[in-house]
Amino acid sequence: LKGVVEAVARNMNLRVSADSRPEQGSFYRSDHFPFAKAGVPSISLKEGDDYVGHSKEWGEEQFKAYNSAHYHQPSDEMRDTWDFRGMIQEGEIALAIGRMISDMPEKPKFNPGDEFAKPTR
C-alpha cells in the first residue's frame, strides 16, 4: 500500500515519512496487527513532526509530556484544549486512501519479501 499512500500524499501536498519512534513498536501493538499477521495489508497513519506554528521540538515536548503523564492513565481523557485540525486532515487522508484502494482492480497484498507476505495464525 506504500504506493497508494505516497500517491495520496502527493495529491494533498504532503510527505510520507518513516515512523519517527519505531522503538515503540506501535504497529505491533495496533488493533490491525492481527490482520497483518493473517496476510491482510493495513497501514498506520500517525501525526508527523511538522506542526503549524510550532517547532519539531515543541511537538516532541508535547508527545513526551502526554506519554509520560497521561497515556493509559486515569487522566487519559479528551481535553477542551486539544486542536483537532490535524485529525481532520488525517481523516481526509484515510478517506482518499480508502477510495484509491476501492478503485484498484485487485485486492491489495503484501510485496514478496515483506515481513507479513506469508500469513501466520
Q: Where on the chain are the PLM-derived regions?
A:
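Secretory-pathway/membrane protein signature
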Residues: 1-121
